[in-house]
Each structure stands twice: as structure tokens, then as C-alpha cells.
């Protein structure tokens, strides 16, 4: 399924650039994109500057983050709300991305050493 089908048209309408983070974890790469001054030594800064422009406009640069791990969902929603207040578009999608349609198992290790499994 195309990710545009997962995001509403209004969420990406007006985006000149769209960064797709497939396997976003906690969304740090999106922070590198939108908040480069907080990460001056990030190796991604040069890549983002090259492809999105060093003087990119965060109002027309958008990010779509795919992350299937439910443990990270609340973090992505908080990040989305923070960016929304600034007028920046960050679309977290609670889904995995892959080339094959076969099921996968997501393993989450807790601080107590327990392992939970989520079939996706």
C-alpha cells in the first residue's frame, strides 16, 4: 500500500519536500531534519542540506514516519503535537514498511528482561 493512502491528502498538501522515515524508532531523524541546530554534529545534516536545502522552509518540508512498535506511539504523537504548534507537518504512521507482504515478529525487551512479541 502506498503511504499516501495512509496519510490524508490534507496532511501532505503543500509539502514541497517529503522525508520518509521507514523504521523511525523514536523519530530522531525527523528531529535532525526539523531541528538541525540542536544536532550540529549529525552526519545527516549534510544529507538533509543537500536534498532538502540548507535554508529549507519547515512549513513546506514534511516528514512521514513509519514505526510499528506500539511502545513508541505515544512519543510520536507528542512529537507531532509539538511540531504542529510550530506549523511543521510530521505524520507518524503506526505501520511497518517492507518489500514483502509476509508477517514479521516485533520483539520488545523490557527493563526487567522480559520479551514481548507482536506479530505484524
Language model: regions and residue ranges:
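Phosphate/nucleotide-binding beta-alpha loop and adjacent structural elements of enzyme active sites
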Residues: 1-120
Amino acid at each position: 500500500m502506498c503511504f499516501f493512502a495512509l496519510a490524508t491528502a490534507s496532511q501532505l498538501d503543500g509539502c514541497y519536500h517529503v522525508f520518509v522515515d521507514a523504521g523511525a524508532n523514536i523519530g530522531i531523524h525527523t528531529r535532525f531534519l526539523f531541528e538541525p541546530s540542536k544536532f550540529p554534529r549529525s552526519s545527516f545534516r549534510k544529507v538533509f542540506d543537500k536534498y532538502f536545502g540548507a535554508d529549507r522552509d519547515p512549513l513546506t518540508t514534511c516528514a512521514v514516519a513509519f514505526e510499528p512498535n506500539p511502545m513508541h506511539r505515544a512519543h510520536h504523537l507528542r512529537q507531532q503535537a509539538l511540531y504542529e504548534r510550530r506549523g511543521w507537518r510530521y505524520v507518524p504512521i503506526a505501520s511497518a514498511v517492507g518489500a514483502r507482504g509476509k508477517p514479521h515478529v516485533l520483539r520488545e525487551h523490557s527493563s526487567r528482561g522480559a520479551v514481548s512479541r507482536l506479530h505484524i
